[in-house]
């Protein structure tokens, strides 16, 4: 046990490891009514340059489904969650292989209301910055071309509409996602920590409004994109 914790601290840092372990314990003891959620926010530059060449010749197909598409019956998200996302005007691209679900990526060109905590995400500037979330690929397909093909398609779509950036949130413990986003030129944009105690939610963030406490209302976090895509690290 000590060795496992030591490796986690070495990989993610003492604070992030502590927050993660506390969340696991609190969630388990409270039947998920008490949670401590830690998020990093990143900005990724939009580019019309494809990662995958000759994508049309591959067996994996990428398309944008309507809300009533039967493919959603195969995806690992409840029907109510999918319906709420379309209600919020979110869009997604789905990857399929031989008509079977492989993965998807969701994004919003406007505000987005989080489904893990009470929070409204507002990417800015309008028409320049989008919000992407819930990138999922079936475990057996994660070493294949599904993710880069999905990412290419989102980039093409947003680039054609004039977008320069897409923002996203990532758990500091999700090393794979952090590594992937850094390879895409992601820039760290802030952090937020949510303590959920049944109906009470306490937020502390490096971004305005910095501190928010409520039982019903949700904080609104404005995520401002970097000045220029050329500034990416």
Predicted regions and their residues:
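Acyl-donor-binding surface of acyltransferase catalytic domains
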Residues: 1-73, 79-81
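Conserved catalytic-core motifs of GNAT/GCN5-like acyltransferases
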Residues: 42, 187-202
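Catalytic micro-motifs at enzyme active sites that drive phosphoryl/nucleotidyl and oxygen chemistry
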Residues: 80-84, 118-119
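Conserved acyl-donor/pantetheine-binding loop and adjacent beta-alpha core of acyl/acetyltransferases
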Residues: 88, 96, 100, 104-130, ...
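Conserved acetyl-CoA-binding loop-helix of GNAT-fold acetyltransferases
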Residues: 131-160, 179, 183
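Conserved GNAT acetyl-CoA-binding A-motif
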Residues: 158-170
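Conserved active-site alpha-helix within GNAT-family acetyltransferase domains
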Residues: 172-190
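Long, compositionally biased intrinsically disordered regions
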Residues: 217-233
